[in-house]
């Protein structure tokens, strides 16, 4: 409040005179009105109070009754308070709490209204999930088979960063021929999709490194485990930006290139089980399954406000990743079942389970414009073991089921946040196995 009149009009002093016209050695200054200050709330409050919306009257907010104010006096940016703690959080609604009747695009988020205020419209999280399966049971002599296949298709149905390491469009090796560095020597075998890093953002004259996905390379093409070494070679990480100085224009200019649509994931999951008798009182069984599960929505939802904060130098704490893939579990089991008598049976089995693409925190070290931590499909785990089960059917007043499992488990984390402290350490490529 009053931000537009905090400064004094030093170019137009007001002299003080007594009744006889004698100068009193005192100069005072009126408030200087700054029309460039964002001031939606200030302007609307002045209008509600009957003041000139562009006037210099000083308003004491604490002196007014709360009923004087309303939420629609604010702009979206004023309530989002980018660079500090937000006053509102929303998606599927506008910042005033009105439900959206259409699905806004990314351009609607960066677009402005008739007063020039950013709309900041954020659509609801509406992933598209489809699945289908076919299964058949049949016997062949003494063999009993249960065979099927399931197909899952997951589409997060939202925008994702085109490159999680660079917020703005950057040149790749394949683009160099049309740039000022067309004569640069590129190491043999370097992918055309590798992002180029240079010595200067505004006037690059040399290449200092490359990055292909999450793999970094020196200017000579050698794999670099620590991207900080590439950053140090140029006094800070400097991707070869297509629009130098774009930081002053922000993502509102580059949104169409900085983001892309989520690529749907299609998973084919075969499932096979069979069993056959060894004798009249014993049988052998086995199965093989692949299962998939969708990402946690709280870790997967696209929130464009996140990238506004990154542009302002705020990397948050743990950021959601709209580009997460489904998690996969592969399960094997073989076993033997023996009838002990007409009322009891014993089951012995061995199992192996492998889990891939599980959620874990990932440090995007030397991302541009700021290093940040997000969730990724990084974790894996394996478990194997044996199970002994005994079943006693009701005999008199006794019925019993007992089992014992011996399991050995290894993994890179016990939960999505178990690696957060390591990610915060700023050290790239640190992984560990538990236990």
Predicted regions and their residues:
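Transmembrane beta-barrel architecture of outer-membrane proteins
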Residues: 124-132, 140, 151-159, 264-270, ...
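Membrane-embedded beta-barrel scaffold of Gram-negative outer-membrane proteins
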Residues: 277, 283-295, 299-301, 306, ...
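Gram-negative outer-membrane beta-barrel transporters
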Residues: 347-435
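Flexible, surface-exposed loop regions and adjacent strand-edge segments
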Residues: 2, 162-172, 177, 255, ...
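Transmembrane beta-barrel domains of outer membrane proteins
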Residues: 135-139, 273-275, 335-337, 389-392, ...
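Composition-driven recognition of long, C-terminal low-complexity regions enriched in serine/threonine
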Residues: 147, 254, 258-259, 264-267, ...
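Signature of Gram-negative outer-membrane beta-barrel scaffolds
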Residues: 1-277
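Extracytoplasmic loops and strand-loop junctions of Gram-negative outer membrane beta-barrel proteins
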Residues: 111-120, 244, 250-258, 313-320, ...
């Amino acid at each position: 409040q009053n931000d537009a009149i905090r400064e004094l009009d030093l170019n137009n002093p007001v002299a003080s005179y007594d009744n006889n016209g004698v100068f009193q050695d005192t100069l005072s200054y009126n408030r200087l009105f700054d029309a460039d200050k964002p001031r939606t709330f200030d302007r609307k409050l002045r209008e509600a109070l009957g003041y000139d919306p562009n006037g210099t009257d000083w308003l004491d907010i604490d002196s007014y009754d709360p009923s004087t104010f309303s939420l629609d006096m604010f702009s979206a940016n004023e309530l989002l308070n980018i660079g500090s703690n937000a006053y509102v959080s929303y998606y599927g609604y506008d910042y005033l709490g009105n439900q959206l009747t259409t699905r806004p695009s990314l351009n609607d988020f960066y677009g402005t209204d008739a007063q020039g205020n950013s709309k900041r419209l954020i659509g609801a999280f509406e992933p598209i999930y489809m699945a289908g399966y076919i299964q058949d049971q049949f016997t062949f002599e003494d063999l009993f088979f249960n065979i099927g296949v399931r197909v899952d298709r997951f589409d997060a149905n939202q925008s994702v960063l085109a490159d999680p390491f660079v917020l703005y469009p950057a040149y790749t090796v394949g683009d160099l021929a049309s740039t000022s560095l067309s004569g640069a020597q590129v190491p043999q075998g370097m992918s055309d999709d590798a992002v180029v890093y240079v010595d200067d953002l505004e006037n690059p004259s040399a290449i200092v490194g490359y990055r292909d996905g999450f793999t970094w390379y020196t200017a000579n093409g050698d794999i670099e485990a620590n991207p900080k070494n590439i950053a140090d070679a140029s006094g800070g990480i400097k991707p070869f930006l297509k629009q130098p100085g774009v930081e002053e224009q922000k993502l509102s200019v580059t949104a169409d290139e900085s983001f892309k649509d989520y690529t749907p994931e299609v998973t084919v999951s075969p499932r096979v089980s069979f069993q056959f008798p060894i004798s009249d009182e014993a049988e052998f069984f086995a199965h093989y399954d692949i299962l998939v599960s969708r990402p946690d929505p709280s870790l997967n939802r696209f929130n464009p406000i996140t990238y506004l904060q990154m542009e302002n130098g705020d990397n948050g704490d743990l950021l959601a990743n709209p580009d997460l893939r489904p998690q996969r579990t592969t399960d094997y089991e073989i076993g033997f079942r023996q009838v002990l008598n007409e009322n009891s049976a014993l089951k012995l089995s061995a199992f192996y389970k492998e889990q891939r693409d599980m959620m874990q925190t990932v440090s995007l070290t030397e991302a541009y414009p700021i290093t940040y931590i997000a969730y990724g499909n990084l974790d894996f785990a394996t478990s194997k073991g044996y199970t002994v089960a005994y079943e006693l059917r009701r005999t008199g007043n006794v019925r019993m089921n007992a089992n014992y499992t011996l399991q050995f488990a290894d993994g890179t984390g016990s939960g999505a946040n178990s690696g957060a402290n390591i990610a915060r350490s700023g050290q790239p490529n640190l992984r560990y196995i538990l236990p």
